[in-house]
């Protein structure tokens, strides 16, 4: 057996089950072993008096009141009984699980896993434990048709078959010894089934180091390629033409835009290869700066390409650049073009008849030839792998590269995370833009907000509603969103059109729903997914985020940035009843500032204390386990050792480091 065999070779996994696992990205045995839990439930029995409010824990005690089931509403019920631990008596509630009543005998000793509510001195039960279980139990993200129990069973089967012994080591022994790291095989086993918390932490550190080290090695290789390729292109752009276009704009650039533009234009005119990151707050005007840089490249006799992650963004940028530069020839290249249209576009690019080329990853496919590519701009660069970025760069004769991200990143972090890139920052908003008014409300205040919304919609405004996020289950995400969408449809019947957007839809279906929203065919858009960064709907003035405390500051700021794109006053409403102090702090900070750089610093401080938010949509590279902010010290160590290895002449041939070179070749192939 080898790890590249399909999943259905495992006993108990048939072809139909394998299809369900494929939705999680698990297609072969290696994918299964490397599909790590995103958290663990601690099943060590705790004392009731030591629990924090909202903490999940196992409490054991003697059953001192009989279990009673109370029914209310449609198919809803509550099972209630009391446990005594020492001298403390507390209530236990199970919702919609009446069948558990048979398991609860008066006078018996019982262990229950649940969530503690200090104010009510009660535990909301999640699981009755028949016997003492392992202290730490993995919790995996799921897809429809897969339960925690079935996934754990399949992973256990893989380990029982000894498949973990086939996992190849990808770090030399010298690094394992120097940084006191577990072997890869040990770490993978301990990530799934740790014997104790310290073992899990060691495994996590090993996997994080591996991810960050190889990321830094890829950056070092890009850096050395730049050096080997020699000097960059010299783009002698026309000062006169660039100034004329700037003057013709219907607005003046902010000082921050002007400074960033000059840094970019200076790089383009120099003989060194530009490799720059342009970061700016949501709505700070990066697109105009990027557009002027592209125009400058054209005045120097070159083509400029802009690569974005989605078709709807490509179309949006195409329209805005067409309006900015009506005299330039633009080409739009996306995956959905029909064969004849695609041939025509490819021909205009190859012949040099297109000045500006805007597109998705279709820009890097085989068969796309550029006549004279001088500048590449990659928007939301964290959405593209290092390999994809390299391919686009190889399409020209070492063209200048500008990467953009819509999320402010603290400078020290940006410099380490993006290796050798120069960083330009737009930290000012265009004049006249009204700050978004942000309010935090409790769930019970939602009816008043819906009444207020009716008035806003009557005035012609459109609304985004983000459905609660439940990390464990995509199926629950969808169920909640459908329920929310139906409730809003009923509430606004005859007054507003409601549409639903979710992650299971095909990309063309998502694009159509967004297009309908842009064209005002719908008034309210309910979404489970974070609305695409940069999607511009000027008429959308209200963003409502349900269970907002489940998002990190950067995600909340990104969501808020979907509104406030026109000249009307815009609003963000955070609906949350946070149980933790950090959740309350996030809500408070969001209502106090709309400055993304202030929020980025706060996010850094809060994460430093061990709070974990996702890096999705954060503008930073994404990893399976590592988090660039949370794991900054590991990132620094990884950067130092990657820098040292890369500085050794012909390190790829050195027996000590050969393993790294081979693994990088495999990674590049996968990217």
UniProtKB/Swiss-Prot annotation:
It comes from the Bacteria. GO terms for molecular function: ATP binding; ATP hydrolysis activity; DNA binding; DNA helicase activity. Disruption phenotype: Increased sensitivity to UV light and MMS (methyl methane sulphonate), a six- to seven-fold reduction in DNA recombination during transformation. Its EC number is 5.6.2.4. Residues 267-426 form the Helicase ATP-binding domain. It holds the Pfam family Helicase_C. Residues 44-134 are annotated as: Wedge domain. Keywords: ATP-binding, DNA damage, DNA recombination, DNA repair, DNA-binding, Helicase, Hydrolase, Isomerase, Nucleotide-binding. It catalyses: Couples ATP hydrolysis with the unwinding of duplex DNA by translocating in the 3'-5' direction; ATP + H2O = ADP + phosphate + H(+). The keyword Acetylation does not apply. Residues 445-610 form the Helicase C-terminal domain. One of its GO terms (biological process) is DNA repair. ATP binds at residues 280-287. A motif (DEAH box) lies at residues 379-382. Coiled coil: none annotated. Belongs to the helicase family. RecG subfamily. The wedge domain within the N-terminus inserts into the replication fork junction, where the lagging and leading strand split. Monomer. Binds and unwinds Holliday junction (HJ) and partial replication fork DNA. Unwinds R-loops. Plays a critical role in recombination and DNA repair. Helps process Holliday junction intermediates to mature products by catalyzing branch migration. Has replication fork regression activity, unwinds stalled or blocked replication forks to make a HJ that can be resolved. Has a DNA unwinding activity characteristic of a DNA helicase with 3'-5' polarity. Complements a recG deletion mutation in E.coli, restoring UV resistance and poor growth in the presence of mitomycin C. This is ATP-dependent DNA helicase RecG. It comes from Streptococcus pneumoniae serotype 4 (strain ATCC BAA-334 / TIGR4). The lineage of its organism: Bacteria, Bacillati, Bacillota, Bacilli, Lactobacillales.
